[in-house]
Structure formats: C-alpha cells, structure tokens
C-alpha cells in the first residue's frame, strides 16, 4: 500500500473533578487531514492544570496547533531521513515557546493569577521565577500520531498513551513510557531542554499493521486498574468498529469518555483515533 489512508476522529471531555471545581478542560485535540489523506495528523495535549501552570489550557491548545502547523508541511520523503526526524522536537518546542511568550506579552500575568500562585506555593521567590520564565504558566504535554504514505510517525513528550493495534488484535505501545518521579509529575514543553525529553519513532505501515491507532491523555489510562486492562480498550474498539463501524464509535465516544472519567480518574480525557480506511469501510453485523 503506497498511500496509506486513515479515517480519523476524536473527542475531548471535561473530567468530573474539573466540573466540580469549575476548572475548564485543560486538554486539547486537533486533527489534520491533508490532500489525498497525506498526511493525516492527530495531535493532543494535556495542560497540567495545577496552580503553577495556570494558563495550561492556553498552552495545550498552542501545543496541538504548533505540532500540526509544523508537521503538516513535512514531506513524505522527509519521514524516511533520520536527521530530519530528529529535528522535529526542537522545531516544535522552539515554536511553542515563541507562541506562549507572545501570548504573555499581549496579556501579562494578572495580579489575581500571581496571587493564586503565591497562595498555593507560599514562596515569593518561586512567584518571581514564574514571572521571569512565563512559559511555566502554560505547561503541557503533547502527543502526535501522523501518517505519511506508508510511514507512521509517533512523537510524545510527557505522559499519556499511544496504542497500536494490528489486524490480529495485537496491542502494543510504539514508544517507551515516560520516566516520571511520580504519577503526578511528568515531562513538559515548559521545562528547559524540553526537546531532549521527546520520544519519537517512525514505523512502516503495511496496511495490516496498524489497522487502528489510539492516542489518549493520561486521564484515560488512569481510569483503569492496570495497563493490562487499559490495553483491552484497543481490542474492544477494533471489535466494535468491525461490527458497527467508525461512525457508531464516533457517535458514542463522548458519552463513553465522560462515563469513564466519572467512574475512574475524574480527570479530563482526550482520545484521538486513526482507523485504516479498509477497516472503516469494511464492517457489518457478525453473527455466530
């Protein structure tokens, strides 16, 4: 298959805890479909949402926009050149920094924002540090899944998950897990040297592998008792699409994620799905 084609969709829902506290959804999602479905890009981000990162809702939106704006101009042949691939984290980080600093220049941190930060940390020196390095206020993760012809690009900084499902139902992660100090600390675009914290991989797409790719913020996997249970989502989605089709899953996805958050992590959940066009168009009821 020289030109891969995917049907892409996704949803982002506000978590139970954020609904109760009045905090907006800190996640962001953007899906880009290029000419002739080449490239296809899913970008999602999870703004940290803590009092320290009080503009992370803005930061996450800028992260997905930055990733799509940069990667949508990448040529299919570029994906096969390691030296070019290795530059994407630097390009994305540098552009995200520029955008958040411009946002801060146009809208300086208010006394209310800095006051709330001080109330949380009780440390004037740290407040001064954030004032001098404003990108901290915009902290966010970033996950990208992109298809360029017969190549798949996976790129990530921070927590969250990418699951790849082949036509036999085998589920795996194309990237190593983020090394974190704890469940509540993760790598971020806002930290110094962020470009070095990206994990990145390019894999061949042969049509049968993958047939489905799921990208999600950590609010999804944290809603399950174990990663083994979370991996079953990939198989369940594949089976559901084969029986009822992508349109059905797309229609119920928002309600499904809201229920998962309410019964699980309580966090915002964002999911992006890339389903091979052959799988998306080949479904029907299956009877024993």
Predicted features along the sequence, with ranges:
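N-terminal entry segment of metal-dependent catalytic domains or homologous docking segments
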Residues: 1-72, 160, 189-203, 263-272
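Short hydrophobic beta-strand that contains or immediately precedes a catalytic carboxylate
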Residues: 42-46, 155-157, 214-216
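Helix-loop-helix
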Residues: 65-108, 232-255
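Catalytic core of PPM/PP2C metal-dependent serine/threonine phosphatase domains
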Residues: 79-163, 198-207
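C-terminal catalytic subdomain
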Residues: 184-288
């Amino acid at each position: 298959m020289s030109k891969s084609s995917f049907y892409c969709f996704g949803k982002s829902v506000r978590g139970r805890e954020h609904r109760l506290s009045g905090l907006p959804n800190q996640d962001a999602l953007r899906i880009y479909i290029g000419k002739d479905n080449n490239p296809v890009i899913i970008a999602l981000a999870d703004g940290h949402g803590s009092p320290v990162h009080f503009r992370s809702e803005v930061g996450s939106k800028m992260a997905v926009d930055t990733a799509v704006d940069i990667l949508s101009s990448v040529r299919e042949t570029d994906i096969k050149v390691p030296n070019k691939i290795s530059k994407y984290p630097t390009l994305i980080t540098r552009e995200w920094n520029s955008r958040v600093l411009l946002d801060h220049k146009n809208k300086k941190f208010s006394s209310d924002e800095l006051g709330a930060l001080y109330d949380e940390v009780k440390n004037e020196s740290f407040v001064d540090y954030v004032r001098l390095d404003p990108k901290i206020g915009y902290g966010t993760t970033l996950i990208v899944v992109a298809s360029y012809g017969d190549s798949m690009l996976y790129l990530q900084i921070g927590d969250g998950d990418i699951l790849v499902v082949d036509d036999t139902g085998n589920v795996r992660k194309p990237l190593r897990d983020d090394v974190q100090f704890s469940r509540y600390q993760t790598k971020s675009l806002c930290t110094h040297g962020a470009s070095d914290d990206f994990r990145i991989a390019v894999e061949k797409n042969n049509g049968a592998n993958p047939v489905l790719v799921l990208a999600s913020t950590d609010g999804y996997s944290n809603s399950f008792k174990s990663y083994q249970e979370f991996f079953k989502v990939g198989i369940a989605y594949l089976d559901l699409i084969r029986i009822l089709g992508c349109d059905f899953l797309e229609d119920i996805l928002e309600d499904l994620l809201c229920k998962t958050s309410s019964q699980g992590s309580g966090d915002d959940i964002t999911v992006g799905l890339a389903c091979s066009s052959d799988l998306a168009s080949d479904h029907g009821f299956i009877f024993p």
